[in-house]
Amino acid sequence: MELLSRVLLWKLVLLQSSAVLSSGSPGTAAASSSVVSESAVSWAAGTQAVLRCQSPRMVWTQDRLHDRQRVVHWDLSGGPGSQGRRLVDMYSAGEQRVYQPRDRDRLLLSPSAFHDGNFSLLIRAVERGDEGVYTCNLHHHYCHLYESLAVRLEVTDDPLLSRAYWDGEKEVLVVALGAPALMTCVNREHLWTDRHLEEAQQVVHWDRQLPGVPHDRADRLLDLYASGERRAYGPPFLRDRVSVNTNAFARGDFSLRIDDLEPADEGIYSCHLHHHYCGLHERRVFHLRVTEPVFEPPARASPGNGSGHNSVPSPDPTMARGHSIINVIVPEDHTHFFQQLGYVLATLLLFILLLITVVLATRHRHSGGCKTSDRKAGKSKG
C-alpha cells in the first residue's frame, strides 16, 4: 500500500505543470547569432593582421568528475531573516546526499530527475519542524546557470484544511500532520535533462565577405570544434596565410591572424561563436582595410668605408654647430709644434723691440723739450 501511494504521488508530479522553472538561456532554436561588436581595422600591406575574437564562456572544460557539473539541492529556512540549512542535494550522475540523519528515508528525490526534469521533493510524513520556506536550486557549473524556486509549507492538525494556493510570489502548501507533502519543482529544459557531447556542440567559425556581398553569402574560412577538429576553406591565396591558436578553446581566444597581408585581403570578416549546449550565439564583425606598405629609408653607410656611390657622407663631428664655437685642433707632430712656437717667440721679440723704440723716442723728445725751455729762460734774464 505504501509503495502504491508513492507511485501515485510521482505520477501526480509528472502531470503537474504549474510550477516549472524556466531556464535563463535561449533554446537551441535560437541558432542565429547576435552581433556583439563591429569595428573597422586597418593594417599595412606585408604585415600581420590580428582580428581579436575572445570569449571566456567558450572555454572548454571537460567534465572529468563523471557529470558532476549539474546539481540540484533543496534548502529550508524558517522565514525572512532566518538562516537556512541544506536538506538534500543530488548530482546529475545520480549521487544523492541527505545532510541530517533524521531526514534519511524521509526526504526523497527522484533518481531520474536529470532525465525527466522532475526535481520535486517528497516528505513522507510531515512533522511540526518541517514548516518553513523550501527552495529548489538548480546549478549548472559548466554553463554558469543558476535557477531557484521557493515553496512554503504549513502544517495543520485538521486534514480538512489541507490545500495548495499561490500567494503572489510562491506556492503555499497546507499539509496535515503526518501526511506526505510534495514540493513541486519541474524544469524540462534540455540543459537539465540531457547530457550531450558538449565538445560536438561547441564550434567557432570565421567568415569573409567581399564589399557588396551580403552576410548570408559570405565565404567560410575556418571551422574550429572543441574536440580539436579543424577545417580550412577559402581561396588558396588566403587559406595558407590565416591561422588561429591551437589552444583556442583552452584560452577562449579565437583571434584570426593573417600573415603577409595583401590588398586583395580587404573585406568583412566575421567571428561566429556557437555554444549550442549553453545557448550561446555571438558574432563579431571586422571591416578590414589594407593600407600602403611602409618603406623604411635605407641604412646609411658608415663613415670611411667607401661603400655605395650615392651614399651621403656623414657630417664631421668636429664641425661647429654654431658660429659662437671655434674648434682648435693641435696636431701631435713635434716639428710643427716647435715651428709654431718659433713664430710666437719672434712675434713677442718684435713686440719688445717696438716697445723699446717707443720708450726711447719718448725720452728723447722729453729731453729736447727741457733744453729749449732752459734757453728761453736765459734770454729773458739777459
UniProtKB/Swiss-Prot annotation:
Region (Disordered): 297-317
Segments passing through the bilayer: 341-361
Positions of post-translational Phosphoserine modification: S227
Protein name: Matrix remodeling-associated protein 8
Compartments in which it is found: Cell membrane; Cell junction, Tight junction; Cytoplasm; Cell projection, Cilium membrane
Role according to the record: Transmembrane protein which can modulate activity of various signaling pathways, probably via binding to integrin ITGAV:ITGB3. Mediates heterophilic cell-cell interactions in vitro. Inhibits osteoclastogenesis downstream of TNFSF11/RANKL and CSF1, where it may function by attenuating signaling via integrin ITGB3 and MAP kinase p38. Plays a role in cartilage formation where it promotes proliferation and maturation of growth plate chondrocytes. Stimulates formation of primary cilia in chondrocytes.
Motif (RGD 2): 251-253
Segments in the Cytoplasmic topological domain: 362-382
Signal peptide annotation: 1-19
Cystine residue pairs: C53-C136, C185-C271
Biological process per Gene Ontology, one example term: cell adhesion
Keywords, in A-Z order: Cell adhesion, Cell junction, Cell membrane, Cell projection, Cytoplasm, Disulfide bond, Glycoprotein, Immunoglobulin domain, Membrane, Nucleus, Phosphoprotein, Repeat, Signal, Tight junction, Transmembrane, Transmembrane helix
Lineage start: Eukaryota, Metazoa, Chordata, Craniata, Vertebrata
Free-text comment on this protein's domains from its UniProt entry: RGD motif 2 (but not RGD motif 1) is involved in integrin ITGAV:ITGB3 binding.
Protein topology in the membrane: Single-pass type I membrane protein
Membrane is among the record's keywords: yes
Organism, scientific name: Rattus norvegicus (Rat)
Gene Ontology cellular component list: bicellular tight junction; cell surface; ciliary membrane; cytoplasm; nucleus
Residues under site feature: Cleavage: S324, I325
Subunit structure: Homodimer in cis. Does not appear to form trans-homodimers. Interacts with ITGB3; the interaction inhibits ITGAV:ITGB3 heterodimer formation.
Motif window: RGD 1: 128-130
Glycosylated residues (UniProt): N118, N305
Sequence ranges assigned to domain Ig-like V-type in this UniProt record: 26-156, 159-291
Extracellular side: 20-340
